[in-house]
């Protein structure tokens, strides 16, 4: 099953990851560790809450004014 991983840099160092299809989140010190942690968290989630995921989210960027 191919899923989406969205990673952002954490203020305190490392990375935070989100899988938008399931809503699972995790963190790690490196990109590789963070993705591995997200795989594990998402697998555990899907064991408890099986779902058929066929559509992937549309990921885009947008700009907002910041005061």
Question: Predicted segment positions?
Answer:
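Short, charged, surface-exposed hinge/linker loops at domain edges
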Residues: 1-4, 32, 36-67
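Short aromatic-glycine-(Arg/Gly/Cys) micro-motifs in beta-strand/loop hairpins
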Residues: 6-21
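Generic alpha-helical hydrophobic packing signal
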Residues: 17, 25, 63-66
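A short, exposed loop/beta-hairpin motif centered on an aromatic-Gly-Thr core
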Residues: 22-32
């Amino acid at each position: 099953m191919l899923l989406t991983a969205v990673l952002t840099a954490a203020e305190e160092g490392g990375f935070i990851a989100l899988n938008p299809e399931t809503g699972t989140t995790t963190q790690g010190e490196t990109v590789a560790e963070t993705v591995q942690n997200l795989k594990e968290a998402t697998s555990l989630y899907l064991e408890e809450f099986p779902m058929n995921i066929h559509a992937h989210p549309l990921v885009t960027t947008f700009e907002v004014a910041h005061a």
